[in-house]
Amino acid sequence: MRAASFVRCVVAVCVIVMQASVSGAQSLDVYRGVNETQLGWKTPEEREKIIDNMRQAGVGSVRVDLREPFDKYIDSLDLLTRKGLSILMIVQFAEPQLVARDATRRPGRGSIWSVVPLSQLDPEFFREKFGGLWREIERRGIRLAAIEAGNEINWAAFNGDLGLLPPQGQPPQGAPGSVALHDRAAYLLGLRRYVAAVAILKQFRDASVNNRDAKIISAGLTWMPATFAAYVGAEYVDSNETLDILKADGLDAVVDGYGVHFYPGVNQTLSQRNRDFEDLLRPCAVGGRGHSCWLTEWGVRQPNLACPSDESKRVPLIRETVDRIAANVRQKRIGGSYYYDWDDNPIEFTVWRCGGLTEAGKVLFGR
């Protein structure tokens, strides 16, 4: 997402129409979701048009940031609520505004942005700054289906505790699924402080007038081959390893689900895609026991930008992934699913192209 957008163009590293029953008050909207994380940077007219197009396409839920410019992003949340779309709101920890009064960024390189280390996170500063934003969200009557605490905190693009390495390297010996970690102590400290901040989110949610039923989802963790992370020169920690650390720090007591990301590749074999997906969902609940996973990003690349969009390779893989997700929804292993992306960069993944909904988008949203 954004800082990691170049990865989407290379790596095979979000909601859909699901013909599956969903228990309790959980709406089917969160199975017909899509990412549109840049709404706060659009003009009011652009936001209105984008959201109207989404509604007409059959989108049920939108994953959108809460970050600078905060007033514009809250305006976007307000408009989504008034237009009847459900919301998965991401609370970002990669930028200083919610992290600490004196937070500093780790330098970036190229498309890997300069971001704040999670180890700098001051939970009480977060309580103060997020609390003001939350009160405005409540005052406006904005309704949230879920709150995602952070994004891709297990690699260098979104967590400054993870460093940049010489590109085109190789994963170090003895670290399957991960790359480097020159300062593991800082990474572990950052994850502990992250869990403390999520506990504060839960306190606000539990005291809410409008959003007491909103689910709290842990940061969507990226899944990528360690060889690719080494190639681009970025420290990366395996998603399951990171989740195990977070759970040991008390994550399960403060979240309702685990965020995960998945980008299946057209050039992979079916057995490879099945194996990767099962590995991704290893921590997810089976039969409603434990926490389900929320697929807060998944997407399929279509790199030919000519109009009309050539969907011949993408549509079969999207159908395959929709079926795979639906099977896991029925088992209650997946609690929500959001396609990446509606119409923003990287455009190779978007489903709104050439002025309309692509064939891939029609498959996703049942049109």
Place the predicted regions along the sequence by residue.
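Aromatic-rich peripheral "rim/lid" segments of glycoside hydrolase catalytic domains that contact
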Residues: 42-45, 164-179, 303-320, 324-367
